[in-house]
Amino acid sequence: MFKCWSAVLILGFIFLESEGRPTKEAGYGLKSYQPLIRLRHKEKSQERSRIKGFLIQDGPLRSCENKYCGLGRHCVLSRETGQAECACMDLCNRHYKPVCGSDGEFYENHCEVHRAACLKKHKITIVHNEDCFFKGDNCEATEYSKMKSMLLDLQNQKYVTQDNENPNGDDVFRKKLLVDQMFNYFDADRNGLVDINELTQVIKQEELGKDLSDCTLYDLLKYDDFNSDKHLALEEFYRTFQVIQLSLPEDQKLSITTATVGQSTVLSCAIQGELRPPIIWKRNNIILNNLDLEDINDFGDDGSLYITKVTTTHMGNYTCYAEGYEDIYQTHIFQVNVPPVIRVYPESQAREPGVTASLRCHAEGIPNPQLGWLKNGIDITPKLSKQLTLQANGSEVHISNVRYEDTGAYTCIAKNEAGVDEDISSLFVEDSARKTRLGIGNMFYVFYEDGIKVIQPIECEFQRHIKPSEKLLGFQDEVCPKAEGDEVQRCVWATAVNVKDKFIYVAQPTLDRVLLVDVQSQKVIQAVSTDPVPVKLHYDKSHDQVWVLSWGTMEKTSPTLQVITLASGDAPHHTIHTQPVGKQFDRADDFFIPTASLLITHVRFGFILHKDEAVLQKIDLETMSYVKTINLKDYKCVPQSLAYTHLGGYYFIGCKPNSTGEVPPQLLVDSVTDSVLGFNSDVTGTPYVSPDGHYLVSISDVKGLVRVQYITIRGEIQEAFDIHTNLHISDLAFQPSFTEAHQYNIYGSSSTQTDVLFVELASGKVKMIKSLKEPLKAEEWPWNRKNRQIQDSGLFGQYLMTPSKDSLFILDGRLNKLNCEITEVEQGNTVVWVGDA
């Protein structure tokens, strides 16, 4: 019956794979074991002595016949005298009935105790407890797991017949069957508990010791007696051998949880079962438990996932499962609601009787808010008429032929499940008292060869021309000093940024400086020295800093990053270097900082792109220091461009062409875990994301494609629809739709042709605005890949501007047509929109 047990246990008690793990701290008291028979070690040993005496001394056999030596000793014939003497036994018969001696040592049987007492020449008694069984136990975790694995393998061979090798084809069922059978074999008295006596009995019956392994059956009791009661119950056997029966109710396999941004939330895993292993949580197939995340940092004793401060980046799908049992999992769809944030335009306006007035309202939130209007606190809906209408899904109040009684405070109210917001747009109807319309004064600033032009887009009028020779306010420096060898004083500009509609920062790469233009006075007020050849500026609104990328030389041999802090302040400005200098940032080829939006007002992190390196360096914008490296080497992607959506917190990485000219697909990076999730399907090219985060537009010059993907309020990225074009898109601008609330249109300028592409993103409708003259050649604009910029005019802006080689074109976005051309503006490829200051 025990033949198979003998085979495996003699091989060293190799145990099966399990999570039961020996630890030095694990100590368990064991119940007393009373031996059934008290052995005297006399008959066989004395017979051996008589034989030995006969062989050595050649004397009479009966010399030791009547000599009784006691336990642990035997009779021998002295070589000198030939007389029978008692000596310590050379060895005991091999059988395994372990006991503890009063000296604290472990002995394989009673005979060994008495033999040791003889050799040590002091009395050793048998102590009736098993504490010494584990003294000097060297059973390691790996050996213990192997031993248990082999026990299961043996049980499988022993009890599962050839006709039924794989009962039900279910590994969990088969393992449970084997462990049940093993437990029944060990539980000799059928009381539902296995104690040390029964373990000893198994070892004794199989004549197994500890000769071939450092692990024995006693280690089951030592390491897997979870309640420390000195017995092994069937449930403890199940835990020991990882036989776990888990359940997940069918109606809980998919759970939907909704929280409001800024709150904390708990996702609880509904997987149940006795001895359930620890719960593992995944997001986008990335295990969260060991990542030490800032906002997801406490998984609780019950395996729940805690998000301490919910943001829109946390939305998406989460899965939970018991460790080692991935086949049973629960999916949590986590939705994040955001209360509405509202803006109205204009805040105030004056109109003469008989003209048309328009009051517009833009609201964002999750889910999309519903809009309503009040006039002086009363709902205007009952008063709607041909003269007073609501347009664009209620986002615009249109009043034709205004009358004095139309004067009032018009309140736009936005509501969704998370909250409500409102704002007031005031209309004054009065006789020619104010010729200038309140709130109107928005301008394009164009930086070109002959200085700076400030242009009002409606009538295409120049409001100001700052000449190259004009002096900085309060200084002797000129806006564009005449360069040595130049016959004509001219300006060279790279990029420019708007800082809170108060200042414009603009880079002068050939002068190693950044100029500050004061919007209120429309004068240049300061020059900030930078590292050589500053080419790219970005305004980080969250921290009020302007980031400056300088090349060092035109060959980009020593690029650096600098920061101008307190950018909107009135004090004199200066640059500071990012840290650490000379390590992470000194090879910067480009950088990316997400743009703040109506809903997302704080941006914490940005990225540095290094030339020809398949990595992203993450930086903390608050400390301006390196955080970590995200490796893209497995995807063979050298990053060239990035875009970001707060809906699910995804970065889209556009990759450079490889050595064969092939462009790898875009990569997706999860901002919650900083993990690369894989490719964005087969979408390639430069990514752009709409201000509301809902549209991803990818421009693939190689394939001649514009690909549009919609991102849902759950952060799901939908399949792309394609627009084929040979325009070679240079730059892209988003403009809110004038006919549909919560929708956007795009305008794309061409780097080689004279047309601008218009796409209505919701419908896919495409139109071309033609005959806008040729752009600058790429070699005439070395500062970036956008040799023909296109600039929108803000949240409520109707106009866009795009330069050609020597003209400016202002487009009417509401009518989708050319508004006007302004000629004799050469190299005007740096354009900034400034709204109401």
Protein language model features and the residues they cover:
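N-terminal signal peptide
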Residues: 10-29, 837
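Immunoglobulin-superfamily
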Residues: 48, 77-79, 94, 131-186, ...
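Repeated scaffold domains used in trafficking and secretory/extracellular systems
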Residues: 433-437, 473-497, 532-543, 581-599, ...
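Short coil/turn segments that connect the beta-strands within blades of beta-propeller domains
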Residues: 440-442, 501-502, 542-544, 603-605, ...
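Residue position within the beta-strands of beta-propeller blades
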Residues: 446, 506, 548-549, 608, ...
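Structural motif
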Residues: 450-458, 512-516, 555-565, 613-618, ...
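A short beta-strand motif characteristic of beta-propeller blades
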Residues: 461-487, 523-528, 570-589, 625-633, ...
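Blade-level signature of beta-propeller repeat domains, shared across WD40, Kelch, NHL, RCC1
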Residues: 794-837
